[in-house]
Each structure stands twice: as structure tokens, then as C-alpha cells.
């Protein structure tokens, strides 16, 4: 038993002390030191960078070291592999990126904070000017003339994104679909009845959508009271996206160049977005454009499908906002979650790795657990979370008991390269 000054703990289950087999010339990340019985060894755990293209799930309750673990990966990646971080809350990645940019002026990380024009550096208290982020939901990822515009597939994804972010009932989802198709057939933004011209046919905007509401509702020939209610519902949802800085970001013709977002190190922070529904919408929109950018590059032959390496990594913090587990098949949220589930399955072929971060793994869609080849867990305390992640990682019941007792910075990791699991102390990022 414990006495003052001396603590007694149960014997720790054993985890592997064997390193992963890595080709000497392969790029890898010095992840941290292996632990034996909770004590740090001199054995360094190295994680192959190319393995990240097979997706990663990182879980752990608040304050256990998840952000530090991600930053340890990004510090190494930034030398050769671009990345995108979508941060819905807090500003830890912004502060990290600012310090990184001071040390690496030749390879700076782009920082976007919608709703914020200047950010105070917490080290020297100076204001840093923040470039505006522009994202037109109706924009088409059309990189070169030889590529197909693929407007119909964009519309299908966009209507799912709208429906999931702004709950709509009865006939409203159908009206929203009609509205989206209508704005793509305007005289100046006609992508459907005429052949669009590369670089000349402009995408619709939220203003176009507002102007089309009356036309779409009138064509349905509802009685006056119903027509009035339908117009009010649609206009309320559209107008909410046109107000203030949201309008500056979304109600625009031209989006921020895709290469700025998806070809260079980039952090998008959504902490100034107060509404959770808006955060989910913005995150879904960014991921939708990311997927379309990957498919566009593939159409142009810019992706080597024989190369299984990681060409780009996307970190999705609070992943449940776009991949929430939903058991009701009729809800739009379920369809949206399935869209991103399919994206998770397909995007790996383009060399795109997804790093999903969440405090509660059981609230994510099943594919977030099943379809990630790297699983990292920090401390979890709920029994159902420990069981779900433990079974997915293939650890036994005795090993699972250590998950609620992990100290800050400690984690258990399993990968597709080994049948063993490793207990690691992740090195602290400066």
C-alpha cells in the first residue's frame, strides 16, 4: 500500500519495445521514446511519413497532449510535405505557426482566421495582419481548360453540405436543391444549359441564391401562406451567411487560390465563429473543396497512383463536427457523414492523408475508427471509449486498463506496419 512519499501502482501491462521496420532512406518522424512499465527508455519510436496517407485517428480527453502530438508530426512534415490544419476552437495551432514562421522564414505557414483581421503575437505582443479567407460555396475547382468542370458532382456534395449544416424539414431540402440548380442556370452564371468557358464563366454567389428564392417558390404554386413561410425559411438561412465577416468570406465570386490552401503549409482557425452550425458548415465546405482539388489534379494526370506516399496531410480537429455518428438514416446529417466516410476511403489514392482528432472516439462515424491505419490514443476515461478504441487497436484487456491512467504526453499507438502496440512518451514541441 502507499505511504507518504512513496506511491504504489499496479504492475503495468507489457507493450512492444521493437521499432517499426523502416527503409533507411525513407523519411520518418522521431515521434518520441518507447516506455517500458511506464519508464522511459532510450529507444526512439520512428513513424514513416508515407504511412500517414493511410489516415490517422488521434483520440484523448482534453489536456492530455493531443495538440503536442499533432505538432510533433507537423514539425517534421513541413520540411517536405505540405499540410492543412482545420482548427475549430482555441488558437494553439496559430501560436505554434507564428513561432514556426519566425524560425523558418523560407517556408512559412499561411494563417487564416475568418472574422479576425489582426492577431496579437503572444510572445512579443505585436499585431500580425491576417490575410482574408475567401470561399465561394458555388465555386468550381477547374484548374485547366482540358479538365472537365464537374459541376453536377459539386452540386450533389454542396446540397448535402447545406442540408447537414442547416437543419431543414418537410419540403425544404427539395427546395434548396432546386435553388442550387437554378443559380447555376442564370444568364451570367450558366453552367448547365450552356457549355461553360474556362476562365470566363463565373460561379454563382449567395446573392444569386437570394435573388432566385422568389422564382423557385413561385414555380411550386403553393398557397399564399405556405409560400410566404417557405420564402422566409430559405431567406433566413441564406441571409445568415451573408452578414458581417461571413458575407465577406462566402458572398464572393473568387475564392482564395486553391494552391494557397492545398499546396502549402496552412492553418485555418475558426475560433472566431461563434455558432457551432456555422463551424460545421465551414469545415465541410473546406473538406469538400479539398476532395475536389485532389480529383481535379488526378484528371490532369498530376497524381501518380503507383506512388503510395503521403503528398499532403489534412488535420481535422474536433472531427465529430463533420463526421458525427448518426443512427437515423433519414437525417441530412447521416447523408453528410456518409459523404465524408466515402471521401475517407477514396482520398488516400490521391496521396492525401487525413489526421482526425477528437476527444470522444465513439461519437465519430464507424469508418473513422475502422478506416484509419494509424491509431493513437492519449488518456481516455469513459469505459465505452476505452473499449471501442482498444478493440480497434487490437490491444488486450490488460493493456486496455492503462488507457485511463496514461499521463500527459503518453500515448498508445498501433499501425498497419506491425501487429504490436507501442507505449510512447511523445517529445515536447518547443
Residue ranges of each PLM-predicted region?
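Basic- and hydrophobic-enriched, low-structure N-terminal and domain-boundary segments
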Residues: 1-61, 68-73, 308-310, 328
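Conserved beta-strand position immediately N-terminal to the Walker
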Residues: 56, 266, 355
Amino acid at each position: 500500500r502507499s505511504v507518504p512519499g512513496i506511491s504504489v501502482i499496479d504492475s503495468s501491462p507489457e507493450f512492444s519495445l521493437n521499432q517499426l521496420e523502416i527503409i533507411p532512406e525513407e523519411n520518418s518522424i522521431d515521434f518520441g521514446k518507447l516506455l517500458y512499465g511506464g519508464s522511459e527508455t532510450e529507444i526512439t519510436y520512428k513513424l514513416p511519413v508515407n504511412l500517414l496517407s493511410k489516415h490517422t485517428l488521434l483520440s484523448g480527453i482534453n489536456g492530455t497532449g493531443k495538440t503536442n502530438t499533432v505538432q510533433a508530426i507537423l514539425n517534421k512534415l513541413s520540411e517536405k510535405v505540405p499540410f492543412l490544419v482545420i482548427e475549430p476552437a482555441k488558437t494553439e495551432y496559430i501560436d505554434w505557426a507564428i513561432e514556426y514562421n519566425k524560425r523558418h522564414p523560407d517556408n512559412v505557414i499561411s494563417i487564416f482566421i475568418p472574422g479576425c483581421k489582426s492577431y496579437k503575437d503572444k510572445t512579443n505582443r505585436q499585431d500580425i495582419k491576417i490575410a482574408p479567407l475567401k470561399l465561394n460555396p458555388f465555386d468550381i475547382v477547374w484548374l485547366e481548360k482540358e479538365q472537365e468542370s464537374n459541376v453536377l458532382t459539386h452540386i450533389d456534395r454542396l446540397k448535402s453540405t447545406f442540408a447537414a449544416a442547416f437543419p431543414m424539414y418537410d419540403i425544404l431540402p427539395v427546395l434548396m436543391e432546386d435553388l442550387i440548380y437554378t443559380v447555376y442556370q442564370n444568364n451570367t452564371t450558366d453552367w448547365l444549359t450552356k457549355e461553360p468557358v474556362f476562365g470566363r464563366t463565373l460561379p454563382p454567389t449567395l446573392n444569386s441564391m437570394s435573388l432566385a428564392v422568389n422564382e423557385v417558390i413561385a414555380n411550386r404554386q403553393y398557397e399564399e401562406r405556405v409560400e410566404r413561410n417557405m420564402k422566409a425559411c430559405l431567406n433566413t438561412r441564406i441571409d445568415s451567411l451573408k452578414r458581417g465577416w461571413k458575407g465577406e468570406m462566402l458572398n464572393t465570386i473568387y475564392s482564395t487560390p486553391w494552391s494557397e490552401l492545398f499546396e502549402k503549409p496552412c492553418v485555418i482557425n475558426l475560433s472566431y465563429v461563434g455558432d457551432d452550425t456555422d463551424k460545421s458548415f465551414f469545415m465541410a465546405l473546406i473538406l469538400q473543396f479539398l476532395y475536389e482539388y485532389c480529383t481535379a489534379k488526378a484528371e490532369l494526370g498530376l497524381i501518380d497512383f503507383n506512388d503510395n506516399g503521403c503528398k499532403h496531410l489534412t488535420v481535422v480537429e474536433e472531427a465529430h463536427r463533420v463526421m458525427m455518428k448518426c443512427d437515423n438514416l433519414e437525417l441530412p446529417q447521416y447523408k453528410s457523414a456518409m459523404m465524408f466516410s466515402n471521401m475517407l476511403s477514396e482520398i488516400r489514392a490521391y496521396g492525401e492523408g487525413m489526421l482526425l482528432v477528437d476527444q470522444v472516439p465513439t461519437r465519430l462515424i464507424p469508418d473513422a475508427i475502422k478506416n484509419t491505419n494509424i491509431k493513437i490514443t492519449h488518456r481516455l476515461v469513459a469505459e465505452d471509449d476505452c473499449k471501442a478504441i482498444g478493440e480497434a487497436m487490437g490491444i488486450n484487456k490488460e493493456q486496455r486498463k492503462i488507457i485511463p491512467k496514461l499521463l500527459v504526453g503518453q500515448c498508445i499507438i498501433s499501425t498497419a506496419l506491425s501487429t504490436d502496440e507501442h507505449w510512447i512518451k511523445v517529445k515536447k514541441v518547443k
